[in-house]
Curated annotation (Swiss-Prot):
Assigned protein family: Belongs to the aspartate/glutamate racemases family.
Role summary: Provides the (R)-glutamate required for cell wall biosynthesis.
Reaction it catalyzes: L-glutamate = D-glutamate
Positions that bind substrate: D28, S29, Y60, G61, N92, T93, T201, H202
Organism for this UniProt entry: Nostoc sp. (strain PCC 7120 / SAG 25.82 / UTEX 2576)
Gene3D superfamilies linked: 3.40.50.1860
Entry's EC annotation: 5.1.1.3
Any Gene Ontology biological process: cell wall organization
NCBIfam families attached to this UniProt entry: glut_race
Protein name in UniProt: Glutamate racemase
Associated pathway: Cell wall biogenesis; peptidoglycan biosynthesis
InterPro entries: Asp/Glu/hydantoin_racemase, Asp/Glu_race, Asp/Glu_racemase_AS_1, Asp/Glu_racemase_AS_2, Glu_race
Family annotation (PROSITE patterns): ASP_GLU_RACEMASE_1, ASP_GLU_RACEMASE_2
């Protein structure tokens, strides 16, 4: 169970007879899912959103499947209490390790980022590189999704354990980050890839660094763009698209609200008001302690 400093129940004020006005839930381990939120603002400007960052337990990319399932169920239980109409797993690790299991356990649609990203990649190239967290790379989720679409495509995957901590520490411009990125990209460049997939929603935040290191002909796929396109289609199919003006986005985290707010302003263009949700018994990660 959880407790929240102020987010409880249906604070959006919609009725059960107005499911279209219910919010979309978006979650990630940290700020990476803000790349998906930005796409929702662009593609679905009428939708209200609740964003959750599980910052007390990041990074997800080094966790086991059992841990990820526990975390995801905690978040989805909380989202259910917020009366969301849909949830977007704005986290590739969760999409790889938990999506197929938990989507059978809840009565609202849950979308992941991997399949939309894989479909977009196959449309662009035949020699595809995927950079992701170690857990996503180990799962082979992108390779499997791509090969289900086109088994003739070649796929190379690289796990990038240092990227999420560097991004969460706002070290995008640090020369060390460039050197780390160079080391991760080098084996893919040697394979002469024609397409690179951001296999973690944090990675678009590194776009200037990654683009500067890649050959100019390499196309970049940001699954955040394509999962929101899938959201649009799903909402239309279910008759859940909102035609009313949206309510302000609500932000909540399991870790330090102030730290998330400070990080989020750079990517959102405004300072988000962030509230704390305490999942009982959650140990704060060492990274979150370092950031505090």
């Amino acid at each position: 169970m959880y407790s929240s400093s102020s987010i409880e129940g249906n604070l959006y004020g919609f009725s059960a007879q107005e499911p279209q006005r219910a919010p979309i839930g978006v979650f990630d381990s940290g700020v990476g899912g803000l790349t998906v939120l930005r796409q929702i603002y662009r593609q679905l400007p009428n939708e209200s959103v609740i964003y959750f960052g599980d910052t007390a337990r990041l990074p997800y990319g080094i966790r086991s499947q059992a841990e990820i399932l526990t975390f995801v169920r905690d978040i989805l239980d909380w989202m259910q209490q917020q009366h969301v109409k849909m949830v977007v797993m704005a986290c590739n690790t969760s999409s790889a390790l938990a999506l197929d299991i938990v989507r059978e356990e809840y009565d609202f649609p849950i979308l992941g980022v991997i399949l939309p990203g894989a479909k977009a990649a196959v449309q662009q190239g035949k020699r595809i590189g995927v950079i992701s967290t170690p857990a996503t790379a180990k799962s082979n989720a992108y390779r499997q999704a791509i090969w289900e679409i086109d088994p003739n495509v070649e796929v190379w995957q690289v796990g990038c354990p240092e990227f999420v901590p560097l991004i969460e520490q706002n070290r995008i411009q640090d020369p060390y980050t460039t050197e780390v990125a160079r080391a991760y990209l080098e084996p893919l460049i040697q394979q002469d890839i024609d397409t690179l997939v951001y296999g973690c929603t944090h990675y678009p935040l590194l776009a200037p660094v990654l683009r500067s290191l890649l050959p100019p002909q390499v196309k970049i796929i940001d699954p955040a763009v394509h999962v929101v396109t899938a959201c649009t289609q799903e909402l239309d199919l279910l008759g859940l698209s909102n035609t009313h003006p949206p309510l302000p986005t609500r932000f909540a985290v399991s870790g330090c609200p102030q730290q998330f707010s400070q990080s989020g302003v750079h990517w959102l263009g405004y300072t988000p008001l962030v509230e704390a949700v305490d999942f009982a018994g959650v140990p704060v990660s060492q990274l979150q302690q370092d950031l505090a």
